[in-house]
């Protein structure tokens, strides 16, 4: 593991729920701008999505709501008051002084853990238009220089180095490194292509929007 500056979150790290919320907001801002910012219900569905999430979670509205209040206090999310429902948006760019490519990369690292440059290039196609892996490497190095990401050197049996975010706890980092050692290529059963994942994610988003609309209609009866 390459030595990087201490993370500014070392004394108050993000929880796994915090990271999932922020990653989901980053993703939906890019992929479904027509429904962003997200209501609490839509955000819960995004967090619990079955695709493009490692690991898959089953969070409750109470868990997400509690985490949102904590993130709001840290200046990482913002509540947008609405006539029908309150909505939430992330403020990572402003809160951490990041440019759009860096926000996109952090979002992916929040959602799927340590990833290779090629994985990030493939998975980022709906979040930001990166030219190549070298452009991704450049922004990751900028993040690492501020203690927000870390370069994990490949181990025996692995073909590529990986990167992960450093906004979580030391225990999260150690667990990720240990997982890399026990499962070098992180083999996944029946891995989906990026296009297939995108189509499934879009369907899940449409379903979430329909469920939210139905809830509003029932509430107006």
From Swiss-Prot:
InterPro entries: DUF480, WH-like_DNA-bd_sf, WH_DNA-bd_sf
Coiled-coil segments on the chain, per record: none
SUPFAM superfamilies assigned to the protein according to its UniProt record, in alphabetical order: Winged helix' DNA-binding domain (SSF46785)
Superkingdom per UniProt: Bacteria
Family: Belongs to the UPF0502 family.
PANTHER family: UPF0502 PROTEIN YCEH (PTHR38768:SF1)
Protein name in the entry: UPF0502 protein PSPA7_1674
């Amino acid at each position: 593991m390459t030595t990087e500056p201490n993370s500014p979150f070392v004394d108050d790290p993000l929880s796994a729920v915090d990271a999932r919320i922020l990653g989901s907001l980053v993703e939906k801002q890019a992929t479904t701008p027509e429904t962003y910012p997200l209501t609490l219900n839509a955000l819960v569905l995004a967090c619990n999505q079955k695709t493009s999430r490692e690991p898959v979670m089953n969070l409750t509205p109470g868990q997400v709501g509690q985490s949102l209040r904590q993130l709001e206090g840290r200046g990482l999310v913002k509540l947008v008051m609405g006539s029908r429902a309150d909505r939430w948006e992330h403020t990572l760019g402003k809160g951490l002084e990041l440019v759009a490519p860096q926000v996109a990369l952090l979002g992916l690292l929040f959602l799927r853990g340590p990833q290779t440059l090629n994985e990030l290039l493939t998975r980022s196609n709906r979040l930001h238009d990166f030219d190549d892996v070298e452009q991704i490497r450049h922004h990751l190095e900028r993040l690492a220089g501020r203690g927000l990401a870390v370069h994990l050197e490949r181990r025996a049996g692995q073909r590529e180095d990986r990167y992960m975010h450093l906004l979580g706890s030391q225990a999260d980092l150690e667990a990720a490194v240990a997982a890399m050692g026990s499962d070098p290529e992180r083999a996944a059963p029946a891995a989906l292509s990026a296009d297939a994942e995108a189509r499934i994610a879009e369907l899940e988003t449409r379903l979430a929007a329909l469920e939210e609309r139905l809830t509003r209609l029932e509430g107006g009866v």
